[in-house]
Swiss-Prot record:
Keywords, sorted A to Z: Chloroplast, Nucleus, Plastid, Transit peptide
Source species of the chain: Arabidopsis thaliana
Transit peptide: 1-38
Name used for this protein in its record: Sigma factor binding protein 2, chloroplastic
Chain location of the short sequence motif Bipartite nuclear localization signal per the record: 13-29
Species lineage: Eukaryota, Viridiplantae, Streptophyta, Embryophyta, Tracheophyta
Length: 141
C-alpha cells in the first residue's frame, strides 16, 4: 500500500467514526390547559357537630367541587347584627318530641373581622398545641 491509500483509509475511518451532528430537538409547546381553581373564603363560620367517621364527608360537602355557592356576605358584623338572628339562621329540630329554636350568633357583643381572626388562629395551630392523628381525632399534647 502506498502512502496515499493509507491516508485515505485513515480519513475514511475518522469520518465514519465521528458522530453526525443531530439537530437539537425542538421543545413542544405544552397543550395543557389550566382549569381555574375555586377558592372559597368563609366569612360566616358556623359550628357543626359530626362524628369523626363523617367529618371528611362533611368537609367535602361544604367545600368540595360540587358545593353550593354561598351568597356574598359581609366580612364584618356589628353588635346590631348580633341581636337579630335572621330566618335562615334558625334551626328548628325536634328533640324528644319538643321543638327548640336555636340559632347561631357569630360572636356575642363583639365586632368580628375575618382576616384578624384567621391570622390569630393560624398562629395558634402552628404552635403544635394540638395534634391531629391519622384517625382524625384531635388531642392535646
Amino acid at each position: 500500500m502506498d502512502q496515499s491509500s493509507s491516508t485515505l483509509l485513515i480519513n475514511q475511518r475518522k469520518s465514519s467514526s465521528s458522530p453526525t451532528r443531530i439537530p437539537p430537538k425542538q421543545k413542544r409547546k405544552s397543550t395543557t390547559t389550566h382549569k381555574p381553581i375555586k377558592v372559597r373564603y368563609i366569612s360566616n363560620p358556623m359550628r357543626v357537630e359530626t362524628c369523626p367517621s363523617k367529618f371528611r364527608e362533611l368537609v367535602q360537602e361544604l367545600t368540595g367541587q360540587d358545593a353550593a355557592d354561598l351568597p356574598p356576605s359581609p366580612t364584618t358584623f356589628t353588635a346590631v347584627d348580633l341581636h337579630r338572628p335572621c330566618e335562615s339562621e334558625m334551626n328548628l329540630e325536634p328533640l324528644d318530641g319538643e321543638v327548640r329554636g336555636e340559632y347561631y350568633s357569630p360572636l356575642d357583643e363583639e365586632v368580628f373581622n375575618a382576616p384578624q381572626m384567621s391570622a390569630g388562629l393560624s398562629g395558634f395551630f402552628s404552635s403544635g398545641f394540638y395534634n391531629v392523628n391519622a384517625l382524625g381525632s384531635i388531642g392535646s399534647l
